[in-house]
Amino acid sequence: MEPLYQAGSILMTVNTLQGKKMIESGLQSGDFSLSQSWPSCLPPPADLEILQQKVAGVQRELEDFKKEALKSIHYLEDAFCEMNGALVQQEEQAARVRQRLREEEDRGIVRNKVLTFLLPREKQLREHCKRLEDLLLDRGRDALRATKKSQAD
């Protein structure tokens, strides 16, 4: 997009000595009106009109830019709010997951303690059962021998 105006220089001839004299005489007399030579420093009315139009165009562009900037800021604020809401949800979900992990860890610790307690007991019970089986088998053999012996007699 081309700018509505072109940067250029406006040349003005300034007679500082004359300006100083104007100020001094104005201060002394209380007259702050411009001298007759002042209008010669202003650009011609046609150029002034063009400059005013360009300034008005730039002001419109500035207002449009402000509106677009505000619209973008509102859009970014909305997006930030959405992202913040999503972040809060994810943090809540992460907290729930951490809680579940802690609970599972606690259950695992309890399971390990139970297994640590039960495994030696299981071994003891197996050994005891084996001894009882052996006793029963020995008694059964003894009873069988006694029966055979009594039958043989």
Curated annotation (Swiss-Prot):
Pfam short name (any one): DUF4715
GN (gene name): CCDC182
GO biological process: female gonad development
UniProt-recorded name of the protein: Coiled-coil domain-containing protein 182
Coiled-coil zones: 46-109
Keyword tags: Coiled coil
UniProt-listed InterPro entries: DUF4715
Highest taxon of source: Eukaryota
Keyword Coiled coil: yes
Coiled coil listed as a keyword: yes
